[in-house]
Structure formats: C-alpha cells, structure tokens
Amino acid sequence: MLEFLRGRDVLVAGWGISGRSLVEPLRDIGAHPVVTDSGAKALAEAAELGLEVATSVELESADLSRFALVITSPGWRPDSPVLVSAVTEGIPVWGDVEFAWWVDQARIYGPVRKWLVVTGTNGKTTTTQMTHAILRAAGIASVACGNIGLPILDALRRNPGPQVLAVELSSFQLHWAPSVRPEAGVVLNVAEDHLDWHGGLDAYAAAKARALVGRIGVVGLDDPVAAALARRSKARRTVGFRVGVPADGELGVVDGKLLDRAFTKAAILAEVGDISPPGPAGVADALAAAALTRAIDVAPQFVKEGLQEHKVGPHRAAFVREVAGVEFIDDSKATNPHAARSSILAHPHVVWIAGGRLKGAAVEDLVEEVADRLVAAVLIGVDAPVIAAALARHAPEVPVVEVRAGDDAVMADDPLRPDEADAVMAAAVRTAAGYARAGDTVLLAPAAASLDMFADYTHRGRSFADAVHALEDGDIGRQP
C-alpha cells in the first residue's frame, strides 16, 4: 500500500507532535517529507532539522502535483485551502493515524499490532489509561498512544515493540483515518463538541462512529447518541455497556460489581469501590476498558487487577485540598458541557468555576439539569456571558460572578499572558471560596476549552491548584 510513496514527495501539513512523528517513518519507506505550517517558528524548526519547508500561504496558489500524498495534522479542517487544493488536484489526503495504520499493516516496524480504539466526547483518556493498565496486568506488551500524547508512529517504532495499542482517537483523527479497522473500538458518548470544526452534530457523530468498523464495536448505552450508533455499527459484532443491570450481550453493574454478560454468561470483573475516579463516569469508563480487553480474551482477574492499579490522571476530577471543610476539585479536563455535567452531578453542593471557549456547544441543558446542585457560579473566559445568561434563565436564584482581567482583556481573541490568566484564576478561586461553606465543593469544571486564556487545560488546572493552595481558612464563607 505504501510502495507508491517510494522516491516521491509527501507534504506534511502541520508541524506539531503528529507532524514531527511522520518524518522518520516517511524516510524509512523512501519518501521525501516536505513540511508546511502557518507558523514561522515551526517552519524554522523544521528547516533546522534539514527538512524542506514551504509556507501554507505559498502552497495555496502553488501546483501541488509534485506530491504523492498530503498527511495532515488532525487539527487542519477539511476546508483549509491547502487541503482543498490537494483534493481538487486528485492528491490523497490522509491523517497521521491513517498513515500509521498502513505503516503497521505493511509491517515496517514488526508484526501487525492489535488496535484497541477509544473515542467519545468525554472519558477518552481515562478509558485509554484503564485499558493500558488492564493489558499491563495481563502481561501483554502494550502502549497507550494517539490523542493521549504519544504519537502512534512513535509507539510502532519502539523496540521492543508492543503487541497491543490502546489508542485514544479524537473526532478529528477519525475523520482523517477512514481505513482503520481496530480489533475492538468503543464510542463512549457523543455530546456537542467541536461543532465549529465538523459543521454539526451529525458529522461529529459520524466521525466518532468510525471506531465501530472492526471486529468488535462497543457503545455506551447510557448515552442516547452513542447507543443509536450501535444500529449503524459496521463492526462484525457490537456490544454495549451501561451503569446499571446489563442484559445479555452487555456489560454493566449489579450489586456494586462490574459484570460481563457480553463475552461470557456472567463474570464479575471488579468492585465499583475500586474504580478511580469514583462516580458514574469513572464506572462507565471502566466498563468500556473492560469490554475492549475482554474482546481480546483478557481474563476477568486481570481486568480486576488493572482497574485496581489504575489511578486517575491530573486535572480529571482530582482532589486538590480541603480548606475549613470545603473540598476543592480540579476537573479542568471537563472541556465541554457533557463532561461538566458528569463532574457536577458527582457532588451535592457545588460552587462552580466555569468558562472559556464553548466551541459552539450549548449550555442550556447542562445548567437546567444541575441547577439544584449549585451554591454559586464563578465564571471566567470569553464565553462567560453565555453561561451567565443560561444561569439567569434556569437558575435565577444562584449567585453568579464574572471574573475578568482588566478592561475586559479576557474577551480578546489572543490568549492572556500566563501571569494575567493566573491572576484571573486566583481571583475566581478566592471568590468561589467566599461563597462556600463546610460540606460544599468548589469545582473547576469549565465546560469549555481553555485556549482563550491558558496554554492548555493542564495550565488551567495548575493555575487552579496554585490558587487553592494559597487559600487560608479565613477565605472560606466570606460572602453573605
């Protein structure tokens, strides 16, 4: 499949983590990588490595016929001028995941691996980590890769190489990877997110459904959109999971135990109390990871051991500190309303810190559903007014405070300087602490992306934690 690239030029569109991972594999198959990016710094870095570079502006009006293939960063939209030009000229456009799939199928770096693919609006990283933990417990050489941080190509090039890949894939990556056929793939849930990129919920869901095309497809039955995808699944067999009593062919929960009725008559897999993070969302992720690993015949005892060993990563419903009886929880990874909903519903009394860039997602349903849990809301970021308006409609009795940088700087298109963003977060945390009383939870669950203010969600979470650690007992309950 890759022979057509030998001796040919391949355009690498985007010099990020995925773009960098492409260079050596392209050279290993005899292709000549050419890098394009909209950033001068990125192109300078590529040029310093001896790579041929071209600006995206230059290529928009150039003849692209010299290229046998364009491999795009997952963040590049299909309507990007360079990609549109390539398609118009009949040049195939792949994502780095698509290329990695064919590199694996061609055995460039050893025997073909089993791919266990995880996608969904929320819970992808936790499920991928759980899957990897179970595989490790079973003694299976494996690696967690993809959207979780390690490019798949880098995972394939490891020596000794893994037998199984636990692959987290975003909707962007799946859009550009039509050939991937995983051994098993799961769609955890589907809620409004990245609609500005995909153009609508139907297209977004269709991208997620590309995980359901291999030997085993797995869907989250508690999510109506994901459950509906089961009917469209192209997998040879499709099973479901629910945080409730499972029917035949499902995984679920009975009397506090995770139960498999899909791959055997009935097997206990783990105790709900062993799951990290606790709560329905964590249990759902554990069921998904169990389904993926049971699909490749991992024994129940190793599912149990892996889930017991797994601990939630940073910024995912992570406990930061208790101050004067008030818990402070960092769920900065809750970057959309669906994730924020699960986070808020895990606590009875919440002072909610939210806001950022909503990316076209609606918050009306979220606010209406969690209104009775809210003690107060402290809002930051460019779309704070949108959340404030929803709170005014559906939770008018809840105190709402918008915290902004000076002169509305938070509303600017460019991110704030790190010190400015940290100052806004510190003010938000102090304000939230003032509304909290013993027994309450101050919860950072933004329901929005971070890039209007912060470098990424990890920066936002660190900023929150730093502000929490600066609090004193006297900061609690200062508001009337």
Swiss-Prot record:
It is an enzyme of class 6 (ligase). It comes from the Bacteria. Keywords: ATP-binding, Cell cycle, Cell division, Cell shape, Cell wall biogenesis/degradation, Cytoplasm, Ligase, Nucleotide-binding, Peptidoglycan synthesis. InterPro entries: Mur-like_cat_sf, Mur_ligase_C, Mur_ligase_C_dom_sf, Mur_ligase_cen, MurD. GO terms for biological process: cell division; cell wall organization; peptidoglycan biosynthetic process; regulation of cell shape. One of its GO terms (cellular component) is cytoplasm. ATP binds at residues 120-126. Its EC number is 6.3.2.9. Its main location: cytoplasm. SUPFAM superfamilies: MurCD N-terminal domain, MurD-like peptide ligases, catalytic domain, MurD-like peptide ligases, peptide-binding domain. Gene3D superfamilies: Mur ligase, C-terminal domain (3.90.190.20), Mur-like, catalytic domain (3.40.1190.10), NAD(P)-binding Rossmann-like Domain (3.40.50.720). It catalyses: UDP-N-acetyl-alpha-D-muramoyl-L-alanine + D-glutamate + ATP = UDP-N-acetyl-alpha-D-muramoyl-L-alanyl-D-glutamate + ADP + phosphate + H(+). It is found in: Cytoplasm. This is UDP-N-acetylmuramoylalanine--D-glutamate ligase. It comes from Nocardia farcinica (strain IFM 10152).
